[in-house]
Amino acid sequence: MTLKMFFTIIAVLALVHGIGFVILPEQVAASYGMATSASTVLIARLFGAALLGLGLIFWLARNGSSEFVRGVFIATIIGNTVGLIVVVMGTTAGTLNSMGWVAALIYLFGAAGSGYFVMAQSPQLTSR
């Protein structure tokens, strides 16, 4: 997989989920087995806004400088690893239904893919 393809995939995942959380927070939260209240709707929309920002960063990183791309990868490794831990804890505790495992796979893909490009593809970052 190329660096550009990886960024395209994670950008689309973030943007689609972000739009869903902003526009349809009750439905998206319900699909993850979460009860909705005014508070959860607000947090879901804030999460969606953050995902929209991340999606745009990933999209722009497709053509970014190697220093910018490396920084995005490092931030993605950290953020997605923390997200993975949180979603696994929530799913195993029963706070999220089995859709939590889908979110876990998305976080794992982002962290592992970013780690791959940082560790194994450092020359590609400079010669893109």
Where are the language model's segments positioned?
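Cytosolic juxtamembrane helix and N-cap/initiation of the first transmembrane helix
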Residues: 1-13
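Membrane-helix interface segments
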Residues: 2-3, 67-69, 95-98
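Core segments of alpha-helical transmembrane spans in multipass integral membrane proteins
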Residues: 12, 16-22, 40-63, 74-85, ...
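Membrane-embedded alpha-helical segments of multi-pass transporters/permeases
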Residues: 22, 59, 88, 112-118
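Membrane-interface helix termini and inter-helical loops of multi-pass transporters
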Residues: 26-38, 90-96
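Juxtamembrane helix-break-helix junctions at the cytosolic face
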Residues: 57-69, 91-92
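Membrane-helix boundary connector in multi-pass membrane proteins
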Residues: 63, 85-102, 119
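Membrane-water interface at the C-terminal end of transmembrane alpha helices
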Residues: 109-128
